[in-house]
């Protein structure tokens, strides 16, 4: 009798759940790091000039099936209220910005947040970097409000433009006065990208 009751309970359980989830996908498997060929963590600060400004994050390099290159930069940053230099991300000419998402300053209104990222494109053919994304930088060299935030930058290789086997991405931070001259980029790091399409 006990065995029969157990079998009946198991059968009822199976019947109930098989009908409950019938036709549905109960398990989802996200593909992790699909196409990623390089990962570069970074950290840079302006403490050397007495500013509490820093940026940390990761650069992800993706090789697409068509041979193109996708680069995503995810960064957490904090900018000193006395720092007019902010943070700048510099890219070579074969990359174009697809998406720029920022929460800096995270305690600001949506209008304030939208007003802080700036993208500059140089026409100088001799310059190593062509595109500059600046967060919290005042080109009038006036102290900003400072604050914290997160930044997501997505860049794509320009169609029909050759992708070098290796190229740099630059990140600078801080603005200060040196010998009477205002200097943008108190500290600067270069991230070497050695892009290679994977089979």
Residue ranges of predicted features:
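Hydrophobic membrane-insertion alpha-helices, especially the h-region
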Residues: 2-13
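Beta-strand elements of well-folded, non-transmembrane domains
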Residues: 75-79, 91-95, 157-159, 173-177, ...
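Low-complexity, serine/threonine/proline/glycine-rich extracellular segments that form mucin-like
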Residues: 64-110
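Hydrophobic residues positioned within well-ordered beta-strands of beta-sheet architectures
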Residues: 69-73, 85-87, 149-154, 167-171, ...
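A surface/secretory-pathway sequence property marking extracellular, secreted
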Residues: 41, 47, 94-135, 191-193
């Amino acid at each position: 009798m006990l065995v029969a009751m157990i079998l009946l309970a198991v059968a009822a359980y199976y019947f109930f759940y098989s009908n409950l989830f019938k036709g549905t996908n109960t398990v989802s498997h996200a593909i992790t790091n699909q196409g990623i060929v390089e990962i570069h963590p970074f950290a840079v600060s302006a403490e050397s000039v007495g500013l509490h400004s820093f940026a940390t994050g990761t650069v992800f390099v993706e090789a697409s099936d068509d041979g193109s290159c996708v680069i995503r930069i995810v960064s957490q940053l904090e900018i000193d209220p006395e720092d007019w230099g902010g943070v700048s991300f510099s890219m070579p000419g074969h990359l174009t910005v697809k998406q720029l998402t920022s929460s800096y300053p995270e305690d600001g209104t949506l209008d304030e947040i939208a007003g802080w990222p700036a993208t500059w494109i140089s026409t100088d053919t001799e310059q190593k970097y062509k595109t500059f994304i600046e967060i919290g930088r005042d080109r009038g060299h006036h102290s900003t409000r400072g604050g914290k935030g997160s930044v997501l930058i997505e860049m794509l290789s320009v169609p029909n433009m050759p992708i070098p086997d290796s190229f740099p991405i630059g990140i600078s931070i801080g603005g200060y006065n040196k010998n009477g001259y205002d200097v943008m980029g108190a500290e600067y790091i270069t991230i070497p990208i050695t892009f290679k399409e994977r089979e």
